[in-house]
């Protein structure tokens, strides 16, 4: 009996600790980001029960054109939540993955590699070539779509600080 109570107490303590850890999750994001996560959660929660389950994941993958997702992959995704994945857990999982990263600073650092003079611009043609040929290659159509929103000077240089703002905050300027 004593060992049973001890086991119960540690479960309760673990639950309290998990709740304390996740209670701060909403302060990690701006309200607009939370709303976007809520929309993503709603898209995944196919049966609208407030919990993401295996059938929700399978149906979401199916809608994205991936029909033969291995059971192990779905199980691994669900195990990250260490229990039922409601919206708070969903947000916590993203918070843990994004914690300590400043996407804007990471993007600026990457652009600075291509701006040895430190002028805040990169050459459009050189950048286009990188996008088409390196790492996760962009299609020509994707590159043109991106350049449609990209701030450039008359010489065809990309203002990467403004582009970084667009990437991390959207193309609408706050007033």
From Swiss-Prot:
Instruction: List, alphabetically, the GO terms of the cellular component aspect.
Output: cytoplasm; myofibril; myosin complex
Q: Which InterPro entries match?
A: EF-hand-dom_pair, EF_Hand_1_Ca_BS, EF_hand_dom, Myosin_RLC
What protein name is recorded for this chain? Myosin regulatory light chain 2, atrial isoform
Q: Which residues does the record list as N-acetylalanine (modified residue)? A: 2
Q: Please name the Gene3D superfamilies in this protein's record.
A: EF-hand (1.10.238.10)
Q: The EF-hand domain covers which part of the protein?
A: 32-67, 102-137, 138-173
One example of the protein's molecular function in GO is: calcium ion binding
Share any extra remarks: This chain binds calcium.
SUPFAM superfamilies associated with the record = EF-hand
């Amino acid at each position: 009996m004593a060992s049973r109570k001890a086991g119960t107490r540690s479960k309760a303590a673990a639950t309290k600790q998990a709740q304390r850890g996740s209670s701060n999750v909403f302060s990690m994001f701006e309200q607009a980001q939370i709303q976007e996560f809520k929309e993503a959660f709603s898209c995944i929660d196919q049966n609208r029960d407030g919990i993401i389950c295996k059938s929700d994941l399978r149906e979401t993958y199916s809608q994205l054109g991936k029909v033969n997702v291995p059971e192990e992959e779905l199980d691994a995704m669900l195990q990250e939540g260490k229990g039922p994945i409601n919206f708070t857990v969903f947000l916590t999982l993203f918070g843990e993955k994004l914690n300590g990263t400043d996407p804007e600073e990471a993007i600026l650092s990457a652009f600075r590699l291509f701006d040895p003079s430190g002028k805040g611009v990169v050459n459009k043609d050189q950048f286009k070539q990188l996008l088409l040929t390196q790492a996760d290659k962009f299609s020509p159509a994707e590159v043109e779509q991106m350049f449609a929103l990209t701030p450039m000077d008359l010489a065809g240089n990309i203002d990467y600080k403004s582009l970084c703002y667009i990437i991390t905050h959207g193309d609408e300027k706050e007033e």
